[in-house]
């Protein structure tokens, strides 16, 4: 669940109000030949194109005088810096510089730094928009960087774009779609896309990123005129009916009940506090009036049951999500400027703490959706991968990021997983029952809270509920099944592991300083370790090995 908003994960960000002006630095026009590519100096940025192999090129751009030293968490070290020794040619032609291999060619415009990609037959594959990159200065905790954006022309209206990880909004083709990239329970973000037009893009960034629209979704009242159910302008009408039939009515300027109050796990920001949501029914209704005609893209945030109607039509059939773990769902509606249409949101919270939200993107111009935005980066940095088909493109991705290990046969079988097992007997009984019924099973996942309630991060089984964990694992192995345990980079302050990280300065301590307790039992203080520190990662791994490996357990993290 979200405690406040995503920006808290990155610290307080201060945005510069203007794009970096060309007058801020003086650069000599032209290009420089590198061992593995070229650097072109354009009026607003230096653009570097490096050849990785005959099918992969790396494009970097910076408004600074020099590029920052290479450092990547996802690309193999041998492809960083200029250690690579690829075969390519460089040709200067009429204001452009061409970098060509046996399979692809990049053409860089010397005037504006625009990059175009072609295959070996001269077919245009991908084209950056002219003036399609922006750098907006930002500062985070005293560290300077840029909010960056890169856009490309959409050459083929029938193109399909797939990837971006594992998201939960029921979208697969991301052409003309929007997706926010961050890590969240059941949401896995991977900044890589594959196109049906024979290319892939790896966006090398670890900040909050957005594919498509670079802006955050707007509140309804920022895009539409709102009217309550009586027709009065300014709000929607919220009607709250508790399980006993007691009714409360409020005027709602926005439907944005998505974040817990800091330090208060019992209440959601903006929702009425003096109301019992368990077993209740809530309705938000009224009218919206758009100022322009076009396709409006909505995002709903929900837990419990939620249904949405616009202009008398059910645009979102009833969706459910467990109350404590909300999800997002996206839909779009064509609306006409000046036409007021009814809107109704039906919500059953299904818990004492639940979430509801509805925000929107106004229509965007054609060609603005093939875009990548990063909240805080040193530079624009992406890899273009050519392939004869999707499998070939994925092979290029693996070339850059490392080979995918071949899984053992049992890993292709059925995995039994549930929210949690409460006792050793539950685990053994489950596997035993599968065997009795001759239902194939290869792996059982022991998820969270196998530790003592107050010991998250101890990597120890609760001895009362899971006596003799080694014997439990051996028994499962004797039934010809495997065991997997979920682990987290989260530690309660009372655990020895937290203290070990803290002594080295490897804990994010904002939640501890702010006394933010989690939702387990009475609520406990804890936080996460700094996984960007290589020594901290080694410690995390060693702690798991010390406690889990003697039990012959395999480790996973969530989401899987």
Q: Residues of each region from the PLM?
A:
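Residue-level detector of conserved catalytic or cofactor/ligand-binding positions
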Residues: 551-560
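Short, surface-exposed beta-strand/strand-loop-strand elements in extracellular ectodomains
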Residues: 305-315
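Predominantly extracellular/luminal regions of secreted and cell-surface proteins
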Residues: 221-265
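Active-site-adjacent "subsite" loops/lids of carbohydrate-active enzymes
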Residues: 489-551
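A low-complexity, Ser/Thr/Gly/Pro-enriched, surface-exposed linker/loop concept
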Residues: 27-31, 35, 50-97, 135-138
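Catalytic and substrate-binding clefts that recognize carbohydrates or anionic sugar/phosphate headgroups
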Residues: 92-231, 245, 296-300, 310, ...
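The substrate-binding groove and active-site-proximal loops of carbohydrate-active enzymes
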Residues: 383-386, 411-424, 454-467, 520-543
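Catalytic domains of carbohydrate-active enzymes, especially glycoside hydrolases
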Residues: 426-449
């Amino acid at each position: 669940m979200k405690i406040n908003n995503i920006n808290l994960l990155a610290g307080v960000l201060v945005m510069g109000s203007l794009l970096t002006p060309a007058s801020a630095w003086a650069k000599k026009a032209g290009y420089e030949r590198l061992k593995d590519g070229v650097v072109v100096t354009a009026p607003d940025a230096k653009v570097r194109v490096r050849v990785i192999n005959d099918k992969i090129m790396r494009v970097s751009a910076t408004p600074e005088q020099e590029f920052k030293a290479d450092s990547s968490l996802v690309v193999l070290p041998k492809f960083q810096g200029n250690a690579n020794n690829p075969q390519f040619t460089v040709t200067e032609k009429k204001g452009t510089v061409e970098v060509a291999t046996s399979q692809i060619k990049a053409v860089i415009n010397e005037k504006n730094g625009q990059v175009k990609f072609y295959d070996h037959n001269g077919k245009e594959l991908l084209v950056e928009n002219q003036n399609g990159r922006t750098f907006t200065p930002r500062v985070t905790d005293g560290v300077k960087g840029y909010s960056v954006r890169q856009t490309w022309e959409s050459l083929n209206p029938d193109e399909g774009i797939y990837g971006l990880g594992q998201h939960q909004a029921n979208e697969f083709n991301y052409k003309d779609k929007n997706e926010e990239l961050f890590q969240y329970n059941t949401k896995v973000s991977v900044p890589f896309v594959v196109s049906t037009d024979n290319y892939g893009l790896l966006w090398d960034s670890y900040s909050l990123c957005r594919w498509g629209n670079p802006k955050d979704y707007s509140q309804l009242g920022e895009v539409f005129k709102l009217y309550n159910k009586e027709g009065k302008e300014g709000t929607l009408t919220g009607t709250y009916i508790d399980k006993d039939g007691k009714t409360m009515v409020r005027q709602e300027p926005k439907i944005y009940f998505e974040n817990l109050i800091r330090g208060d796990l019992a209440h959601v920001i903006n929702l009425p506090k003096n109301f019992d949501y368990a077993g209740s029914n809530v309705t938000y209704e009224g009218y919206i009036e758009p100022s322009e005609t076009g396709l409006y893209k909505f995002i709903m945030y929900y837990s419990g049951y939620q249904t949405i109607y616009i202009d008398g039509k059910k645009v979102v059939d009833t969706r459910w999500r467990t109350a404590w773990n909300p999800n997002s769902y996206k839909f779009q509606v064509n609306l006409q400027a000046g036409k007021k249409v009814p809107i109704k949101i039906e919500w059953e919270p299904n818990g004492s703490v639940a979430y509801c939200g509805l925000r929107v993107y106004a229509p965007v111009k054609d060609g603005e959706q093939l875009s990548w935005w990063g909240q805080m980066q040193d530079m624009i940095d992406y890899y273009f991968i050519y392939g004869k088909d999707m499998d070939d493109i994925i092979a290029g991705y693996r070339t850059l990021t490392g080979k995918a290990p071949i899984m053992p046969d049992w890993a292709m079988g059925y995995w039994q997983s549930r929210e949690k097992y409460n006792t050793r007997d539950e685990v053994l009984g489950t596997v035993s029952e599968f065997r009795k019924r001759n239902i194939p099973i290869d792996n059982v996942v022991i998820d969270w809270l196998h530790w003592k309630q107050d010991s998250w991060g101890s990597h120890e089984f609760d001895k009362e509920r899971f006596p003799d964990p080694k014997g439990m694992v051996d028994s499962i192995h004797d039934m010809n099944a495997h065991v997997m345990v979920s682990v987290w980079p989260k530690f309660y302050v009372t655990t020895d592991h937290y203290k070990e990280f803290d002594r080295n300065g490897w804990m994010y301590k904002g939640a501890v300083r702010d006394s933010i307790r989690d939702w387990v039992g009475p609520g406990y203080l804890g936080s996460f370790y700094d996984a960007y520190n290589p020594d901290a990662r080694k410690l995390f791994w060693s702690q798991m090995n010390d406690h889990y490996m003697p039990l012959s357990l395999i480790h996973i993290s969530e989401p899987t």
